[in-house]
Amino acid sequence: AGEDVSHELEEKEKALANHSE
């Protein structure tokens, strides 16, 4: 479960950075 959350967080951050750009 922990790994899943880490992966989801990374994807969310990536999406956020992409939206910021």
UniProtKB/Swiss-Prot annotation:
Region entry Disordered, spans: 1-21
Q: Which GO terms describe its molecular function?
A: morphogen activity
Q: Which UniProt keywords apply?
A: Morphogen
For this entry, list what GO says about its biological process.
anatomical structure morphogenesis
Domain of life assignment:
Eukaryota
As for what it does, the entry says: Morphogenetically active peptide. Active in foot development.
Q: What is this protein called?
A: Pedibin
